[in-house]
Amino acid sequence: MIQKLKDFKLTPENTYYATGKRKEAVARVWLLRDRPNTFIVGSDKTNKEYDLREYVQRETLYNKIMYPFKVTGHEGKFGIYATVRGGGISAQAEAIMYGVAKALLQHNPDLRPTLKKAGLLTRDAREKERKKYGQMGARAKYRWSKR
């Protein structure tokens, strides 16, 4: 049975909050100090809460989310509650990872050099390129024949 957000009392004393973005995905992340190894993801699309492993399913995405804890040596010290909106599962996982890194920075500003060296404080700003008129897509063109 997964724990729900209503089971926790979120206060500034026991949580650290940050947002992470990647492509169209936006993640609001709370690190739960009193609840280590509790990982909940709430989807704004379905209005449900899931266990993190159940939500991302792929081990690589789960490891990506946990990477900030691994780099800083804070494995097993915090729980995660995150709400995600928009984008695909991979972009949502990267948004959560970025949010976790920023929340860890709130917990301890001395972690900045470690997180920066691991590349966790730089937002990946690549976005989808827009479709151009007179073309099939952003770069793909319709077939053209001179004669």
Swiss-Prot record:
GO terms for cellular component: cytosolic small ribosomal subunit. GO terms for molecular function: RNA binding; structural constituent of ribosome. It comes from the Bacteria. Pfam families: Ribosomal_S9 (PF00380). Disulfide bonds: none annotated. Residues 128-147 are annotated as: Disordered. One of its GO terms (biological process) is translation. PANTHER family: RIBOSOMAL PROTEIN S9 (PTHR21569), SMALL RIBOSOMAL SUBUNIT PROTEIN US9M (PTHR21569:SF1). Belongs to the universal ribosomal protein uS9 family. This is Small ribosomal subunit protein uS9. It comes from Aquifex aeolicus (strain VF5).
